[in-house]
UniProtKB/Swiss-Prot annotation:
Name of the molecule in the record: Maturase K
GO biological process: mRNA processing; RNA splicing; tRNA processing
Gene Ontology CC annotation, any one: chloroplast
UniProt gene name: matK
Cellular localization per UniProt: Plastid, Chloroplast
Native source species: Hydrangea macrophylla (Bigleaf hydrangea)
UniProt cross-references to Pfam families, sorted A to Z: Intron_maturas2 (PF01348), MatK_N (PF01824)
Length: 506
C-alpha cells in the first residue's frame, strides 16, 4: 500500500479528498486496462509524456460536456484519430479511469479501519465459498426463508448521494453525475429487470461499484438488528473491493439507527438470523415463526422506501417454509426434506418400532432454467430438442468439440454439489447431440452418417474426467472407505465462480 500511495500521490490528494486531479494521469488508464503497476512501462518509460496525456483527457472531458459530440476539428482528428470514432468512446475511456480512481479512498480507509480496530481481514472479506457450508450446516435447523429481490433506486441521483458520505470532491461527484446522465440517455444504465439491477456491459466495473456501495448502505442495518448474525459476503462485484469501507461505516450507522429504529428493535430479537446476498438476490433465514418473518418483510419494505428511497413492494419478498418449498438460489433448487426412518428398540421382552424423521438438505439441478439458457444460446429449442449451432460451423472440428466440451464440463463442475444429478445428464445429452448436429452440418451430412464415418470416439470429450481441483468437502468420520465416501457425497468446488454463464442462468 505504501507503493500505491507513492505511485498515486495519494498523500497529497487524500488530505482533502481530491480525486479529480488523478483522472488526468495516464497510468490510471493503464490500470483500468489491466496493465498493472509495471515500473518499466509507467515510471521508467522515456516516451511517457504527461502533458500530452493531460491534453487528451481534457479534450475528452470538454467534448463530453459539449452539446454536439460530433464536432471534432480536423487537426484533433489527425492527432488523435480514436477521438472521432463515436461519441461513446470518450464516455467509456473516462469512466474506466474514473472507476479505478473512485475505489482508491475506500481501499485506504478500509485498511486503516482494519488496522485501527485490529479486525482480522479474513472475517471481513468472506467469499462465495462460505455460502456452501452455511447451506449444509445451518439450513437443516432453520424454518423460514425470506427470498428477497434487492430493490433498485428510483433515481440515479441516489447513487451519487450515497458516495457523498465518502467522497468530498465536488468535481468528481459532478463528473459521476454526468456519466450517469449520459449512460441513461443512450444505453439505459439501470433498468428494472425482475426488480433487480441490470448493468451495462460497457463499464461493468463502475456500475457494480456504485451498486455495491448503495446496497451496503441499507445492508448495514443488519449489523445492529442482529449483531451475531452469519453475515456472508457478496461476490457479484467481481474484481472490486469486497464490502468497501464496511466496518468504517458502522460507527456512523450506530448513531443513526439507534435513534430511528430503537422502538422497533425489540421485534427482531432472534438469535438465529442469517443473511446472504448474491447476484441481485438475498435471503434472510430464521428459526422463528411465520409471524416473525412477516414482520421482517414489511419492516424491510418500509425501511427501503422511507429511509433509503428505493422502490420496493411486498410482492418482491417471498416467505418460504423450507419443509414445503424449494429455494432457487445460486443456480440450485435447495430444500430441506424429512427422510423417514424406522428404529427397532427392545427392552427386556418388549420391542418397539420408533418412527424417526431426519432432516436432509437437498440441492437439485433446475432443469427448466438450464434448458431456457441453452435455448437462448441456440443449442436447443424451447422444448429441449437439440439443434445445430450454425455460427460455429465455420470452425475446425477440434474447436467445435472444445467449445461444447468446455460448456459441458463447466456445468458439471458447477452442479457437482447437487444431490440429484439426473437432470444434469439430460443437459449433457443436449450438448452432445447439438455438437454432433453442428459437425454434421459443417460436413454436409446427417448425424447418423457422420458418426458412423468418424466413430463415436470423436465426442468422448464430454465424458472425460475432470481434473482434480481444490474443493470443499465435509467428512463426518474417518474410515477406510473415506475415499469412496468423498465421491458419493456432494462436492463444492472453489473455482465455480469462473465458469460459463450457462452454468448460472437468470
Amino acid at each position: 500500500m505504501e507503493e500505491f500511495k507513492r505511485y498515486f500521490e495519494l498523500d497529497r490528494y487524500h488530505q482533502h479528498d481530491f480525486l479529480y486531479p488523478l483522472i488526468f494521469q495516464e497510468y490510471i488508464y493503464a490500470l483500468a486496462h489491466d496493465h498493472g503497476l509495471n515500473r518499466s512501462i509507467l515510471l521508467e518509460n522515456a516516451g511517457y509524456d504527461n502533458k500530452s496525456s493531460l491534453l487528451i483527457v481534457k479534450r475528452l472531458i470538454t467534448r463530453m460536456y459539449e452539446q454536439n459530440h460530433f464536432l471534432i476539428s480536423v487537426n484533433d482528428s489527425n492527432q488523435n484519430q480514436f477521438l472521432g470514432h463515436n461519441k461513446n468512446l470518450s464516455y467509456q475511456m473516462i469512466s474506466e479511469g474514473f472507476s479505478v480512481i473512485v475505489e482508491i479512498p475506500f481501499s485506504l480507509r478500509l485498511i486503516s479501519s482494519l488496522e485501527g480496530k485490529e479486525i482480522v481481514k479474513s472475517h471481513n472479506l468472506r467469499s462465495i465459498h462460505s455460502i456452501f457450508p452455511f447451506l449444509e450446516e445451518k439450513f437443516l435447523h432453520l424454518n423460514y426463508v425470506l427470498d428477497i429481490l434487492i430493490p433498485y433506486p428510483i433515481h440515479l441521483e441516489i447513487l451519487v448521494q450515497t458516495l457523498r458520505h465518502w467522497v468530498k470532491d465536488a468535481s468528481s461527484l459532478h463528473l459521476l453525475r454526468f456519466f450517469l446522465h449520459e449512460y441513461r440517455n443512450w444505453n439505459s444504465l439501470i433498468t428494472p429487470k425482475k426488480t433487480s439491477f441490470f448493468f451495462s456491459k460497457r463499464n461493468e466495473r463502475l456500475f457494480l461499484f456504485l451498486y455495491n456501495s448503495h446496497v451496503c448502505e441499507y445492508e448495514s442495518i443488519f449489523v445492529f438488528l442482529r449483531n451475531q448474525s452469519s453475515h456472508l459476503r457478496s461476490t457479484s462485484s467481481g474484481a472490486l473491493l469486497e464490502r468497501i469501507y464496511f466496518y468504517g461505516k458502522i460507527e456512523h450507522h450506530v448513531e443513526v439507527f439507534a435513534k430511528d429504529f430503537q422502538a422497533m428493535l425489540w421485534l427482531f430479537k432472534d438469535p438465529f438470523i442469517h443473511y446472504v446476498r448474491y447476484q441481485g438476490k438475498s435471503i434472510l433465514a430464521s428459526k422463528g415463526t411465520s409471524l416473525l418473518m412477516n414482520k421482517w418483510k414489511y419492516y424491510l419494505v418500509n425501511c427501503w422506501q422511507c429511509h433509503f428511497y428505493v422502490w420496493s413492494q411486498p410482492r418482491s419478498i417471498y416467505i418460504n417454509q423450507l419443509s414445503n418449498h424449494s429455494l432457487h438460489f445460486l443456480g440450485y433448487l435447495s430444500s430441506v426434506r424429512l427422510n423417514p426412518s424406522m428404529v427397532r428398540s427392545q427392552m427386556l421382552e418388549n420391542s418397539y418400532l420408533i418412527d424417526n424423521a431426519i432432516k436432509k438438505f437437498d440441492t437439485i439441478v433446475p432443469i427448466i432454467p438450464l434448458i431456457g439458457s441453452l435455448a437462448k444460446a441456440k443449442f436447443c429449442n424451447v422444448l429441449g430438442h437439440p439443434i445445430s449451432k450454425p455460427v460455429w460451423a465455420d470452425l475446425s472440428d477440434s474447436d467445435i468439440i472444445d467449445r461444447f466440451g468446455r460448456i459441458c464440463r463447466n456445468l458439471s463442475h458447477y452442479h457437482s454439489g447437487s444431490s440429484k444429478k439426473k437432470s444434469l445428464y439430460r443437459i449433457k445429452y443436449i450438448l452432445r447431440l447439438s455438437c454432433a448436429r453442428t459437425l454434421a452440418r459443417k460436413h454436409k451430412s446427417t448425424v447418423r452418417a457422420f458418426l458412423k464415418r468418424v466413430g463415436s470416439e470423436l465426442l468422448e470429450e464430454f465424458f472425460t474426467e475432470e481434473e482434480p481441483v481444490l474443493s470443499l468437502t465435509f467428512p463426518r468420520a474417518s474410515s477406510t472407505s473415506r475415499g469412496l465416501w468423498l465421491y458419493r457425497r456432494r462436492i463444492w468446488y472453489l473455482d465455480i465462480i469462473c465458469i460459463n454463464d450457462l452454468a448460472n442462468p437468470e
